[in-house]
Amino acid sequence: MDRTTIVSDINALLHITAGCLANWLDEILPRVTDSWWEDCVLSSLSYSQREVAENRNFSKLSDFDLAALLRIADKSWYDMRTVAYLPTSERECVRDMISVRNNWAHCSAELPDKDTILRDLNIILKFAQQVNCEHAVYSKISELTAFIEKPGSIAVPPQRAE
């Protein structure tokens, strides 16, 4: 497996978890208030995210990307706690996912080190379980984790002579 495949596989997992998060939020947010779309969704977005949502006439959570969905979950956390049991550790996982998403959305030409990749995969797995992704997603994450854990799975690039 080459570097491009690793980046591609992790981004595919992030895309899948975005769908799971949209479904999870769809189960909770409408119970918070009748005006949940304005109060919990649109008001949670950054200026640019809200502008995109309005310009493209977003009308459902699945219209949003992972960054926006994570922001909605984080900013609406206390509102959601009024209708669902949501431990603080799960909010911490949402915040960890924001970092993971940023790591891979802004991945440099160099692949992150093995420990970073494994940490990110562990967070993705924990998050996927939290938002009730299908078990097939857990298997994909576990398979990629097992591959990355193998010695020599990620070749360290040679040092350049200065």
Describe the role of every protein-language-model region.
Residues M1-E162:
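Amphipathic alpha-helical interface elements
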